[in-house]
Amino acid sequence: MGTVLSLSPSYRKATLFEDGAATVGHYTAVQNSKNAKDKNLKRHSIISVLPWKRIVAVSAKKKNSKKAQPNSSYQSNIAHLNNENLKKSLSCANLSTFAQPPPAQPPAPPASQLSGSQTGVSSSVKKAPHPAITSAGTPKRVIVQASTSELLRCLGEFLCRRCYRLKHLSPTDPVLWLRSVDRSLLLQGWQDQGFITPANVVFLYMLCRDVISSEVGSDHELQAVLLTCLYLSYSYMGNEISYPLKPFLVESCKEAFWDRCLSVINLMSSKMLQINADPHYFTQVFSDLKNESGQEDKKRLLLGLDR
């Protein structure tokens, strides 16, 4: 009917036991092969990363070298140009020194001229005089000093000589007229300090010298003209914008006062500007005013000699 194949259980167990080592070895072999594949994959990934880093580093170095090359070439060009310019400057300096030879010294005189006492012949060599250091174009600096009272006295003496018809006029009278006006303006508050200073007296003298005539017939006329010149001096040299007319008026008619002011301005406008712009002109007028007292002393000396 059929055959029955029977296997003994001991044999099967034996075979399983006998093959047990082989199956474990096969399992370990499979596991080792898997691990080897994983290790190979890891090694490949590490190997692939390392060359990429090296490539990036190499490319960065190349870029830096490319950037550094133009700078280095530029610096080398600058250094080369500097060297060339230095060589040219040295050559030009050598040429300039060569083109300018040292000045030739004059020949020494012969021994016969030097020993003039022995041969009886005097030496003909003479030293030229040294030129003056100061140039003739620059004007000399003149320093003139005087006090206010001294200049006022000189002004009074000048007015007494100019107005020779006024027999009773003394040098102190014009000074008193000027002082009274200055004091009244101080008391009324029109000025903070006195106007009568050496510079302002010099300015007033410049006006009086050209304005006041020698044909003045009275003290009142002289006072009117003198105070007109003083008002213009205040207006031109004073610190305030305007001053009142009352201290300067000695007559009731203001039109006559303004007419005199206009005539003085038309006559002395250029000199009034010059005395402030030109210090030499101011010094000259200052010296002229100071010399007015010396003329009075000379006149008195001549009168004493005539007697």
From Swiss-Prot:
The modification Phosphoserine is found at residue 8. GO terms for cellular component: axon; contractile muscle fiber; cyclin-dependent protein kinase holoenzyme complex; cytoplasm; dendrite; dendritic spine; growth cone; membrane. It comes from the Eukaryota. Keywords: Biological rhythms, Cell membrane, Cell projection, Cytoplasm, Lipoprotein, Membrane, Myristate, Nucleus, Phosphoprotein, Ubl conjugation. Residues 97-133 are annotated as: Disordered. The modification Phosphothreonine is found at residue 138. A lipid is attached at residue 2 (N-myristoyl glycine). One of its GO terms (molecular function) is calcium ion binding. Pfam families: CDK5_activator. Residues 112-125 have a biased composition (Polar residues). Residues 100-110 have a biased composition (Pro residues). p35 is a neuron specific activator of CDK5. The complex p35/CDK5 is required for neurite outgrowth and cortical lamination. Involved in dendritic spine morphogenesis by mediating the EFNA1-EPHA4 signaling. Activator of TPKII. The complex p35/CDK5 participates in the regulation of the circadian clock by modulating the function of CLOCK protein: phosphorylates CLOCK at 'Thr-451' and 'Thr-461' and regulates the transcriptional activity of the CLOCK-BMAL1 heterodimer in association with altered stability and subcellular distribution. Heterodimer composed of a catalytic subunit CDK5 and a regulatory subunit CDK5R1 (p25) and macromolecular complex composed of at least CDK5, CDK5R1 (p35) and CDK5RAP1 or CDK5RAP2 or CDK5RAP3. Only the heterodimer shows kinase activity. Interacts with EPHA4 and NGEF; may mediate the activation of NGEF by EPHA4. Interacts with RASGRF2. The complex p35/CDK5 interacts with CLOCK. This is Cyclin-dependent kinase 5 activator 1. It comes from Rattus norvegicus (Rat).
